Curated annotation (Swiss-Prot):
Record: active site: 26 (schiff-base intermediate with substrate), 59 (proton donor)
Pyruvic acid (Ser) carried by residues: 26
Subcellular location as annotated: Cytoplasm
Signal peptide boundaries: none
Pathway: Cofactor biosynthesis; (R)-pantothenate biosynthesis; beta-alanine from L-aspartate: step 1/1
Sites where the protein binds substrate: 58, 74-76
GO MF annotation terms: aspartate 1-decarboxylase activity
Annotated function: Catalyzes the pyruvoyl-dependent decarboxylation of aspartate to produce beta-alanine.
Post-translational modification: Is synthesized initially as an inactive proenzyme, which is activated by self-cleavage at a specific serine bond to produce a beta-subunit with a hydroxyl group at its C-terminus and an alpha-subunit with a pyruvoyl group at its N-terminus.
Pfam families named in the record: Asp_decarbox
Annotated protein name in UniProt: Aspartate 1-decarboxylase
Assembly description: Heterooctamer of four alpha and four beta subunits.
InterPro entries: Asp_de-COase-like_dom_sf, Asp_decarbox
Length: 151
């Protein structure tokens, strides 16, 4: 059936904290955000700027832990300014038939104005009994995240 590209991670409405034209490409992101959704350093991401509609692709580098940093670098810095809201997507290639048979899971962080986790969503494709399609499910896991951070 072929290969399809599915979102596996998303940072929704993160706020640009800095734009650094002098750095050689990429986007710097707080490692806490990267770890929670499963984006790796050097992974390619697509970015949408909600303030001006700019869309671009780049790769990720981790910033300082816990600082909430979102910093487009190099040419990407020309497409954003501090305060802009971004959506950052990461994808993976999947075998279509395997997704239909076994499903797929994506992790989504919805950020607050300080780039802290406001909501944490698990979005899943669940195989249907007939084996020919999947159902989409969207569940908030914020209570689980908050409980685990308190222990």
């Amino acid at each position: 059936m072929g290969t399809i590209r599915l979102m596996h991670a998303k940072l929704h409405r993160v706020q640009v904290t800095e734009a650094n034209i002098d750095y050689v490409g990429s986007i710097t992101i707080d490692p806490i955000l990267l770890d929670k959704v499963g984006i790796l350093p050097l992974e390619e991401v697509d970015i949408v700027n909600l303030n001006n509609g700019n869309r671009f692709s780049t790769y990720v580098i981790p910033g300082e832990t816990g600082k909430g940093e979102i910093c487009p670098n190099g040419g990407a810095a020309l497409l954003c300014q501090p305060g802009d809201l971004l959506i950052i997507y990461a994808y993976e290639n999947c075998d279509r038939q395997e997704v239909i048979q076994r499903g797929h899971t994506a992790r989504v962080i919805v950020a607050d104005e300080d780039n802290k986790i406001q909501d944490f969503l698990i979005q899943t494709l669940v195989p249907c009994e007939d084996g020919n399609k999947v159902e989409f499910h969207n569940s908030s896991m914020i209570d689980t995240i908050l409980e685990s951070s308190q222990t």
